[in-house]
């Protein structure tokens, strides 16, 4: 079994089953080439309740997905959900260098939005820019190239319980897999099925 460079792997550790899915990226989209499903009850309210059985469920699902796809799985995107997930809005404000908004100013504004009080038992999962304000002009989707001296980023920050995230990460790592990213399952679903207009 070889590792294909144009392959994405997702793992969903659910309340009733653990799923590993392998997709091959093609110009027209993603073709599902492998799936592994293991019945399990490893999560409760988004939190792992037994590390050892979670590891075994992931291992079995990954082995089945490898067998079906003919690919060796070394890393995966891991879905997370549960009642411990919270969201809050934030605002990041920065001065614009050179009076023209560039990609660096966007990134600095998004980073500035993370300077909020987050309890030590929580971890940021996603920082989702909603819109931008340039010198008081609101509702801007992409301010790159615009003239201005002040940039504000209106951002939605998604956090999760640090222990829940760490237990999922630990379980996947114990199977011998690297984690590409931990992704909020609802966000992944919206990316997969909604058009750009529907997301607005």
Regions found by a protein language model. Name each.
Residues 1-15, 21-200:
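Nucleotide/phosphate-binding catalytic cleft detector across ATP-hydrolyzing
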């Amino acid at each position: 079994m070889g590792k294909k460079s144009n392959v994405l792997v997702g793992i969903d550790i659910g309340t009733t089953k653990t799923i590993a899915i392998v997709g091959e990226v093609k110009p027209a989209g993603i073709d599902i080439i492998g799936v592994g499903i293991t019945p399990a009850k490893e999560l409760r309210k988004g939190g792992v309740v037994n590390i050892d059985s979670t590891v075994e469920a992931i291992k079995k699902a990954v082995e089945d997905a490898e067998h079906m796809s003919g690919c060796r799985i070394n890393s995966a995107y891991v879905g997370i959900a549960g009642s411990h997930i919270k969201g809050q809005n934030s605002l990041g404000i920065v001065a614009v260098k050179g009076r023209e908004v560039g990609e660096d100013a966007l990134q600095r504004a998004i980073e500035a939005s993370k300077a909020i009080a987050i309890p030590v038992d929580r971890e940021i999962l996603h920082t989702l820019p909603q819109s931008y304000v340039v010198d008081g002009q609101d509702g801007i989707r992409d301010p790159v190239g615009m003239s201005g001296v002040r940039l504000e980023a209106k951002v939605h920050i998604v956090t999760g319980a640090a222990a829940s995230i760490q237990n999922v990460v630990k379980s996947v790592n114990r199977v011998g897999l690297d984690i590409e990213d931990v992704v909020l399952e609802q966000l992944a679903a919206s990316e997969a099925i909604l058009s750009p207009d529907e997301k607005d």
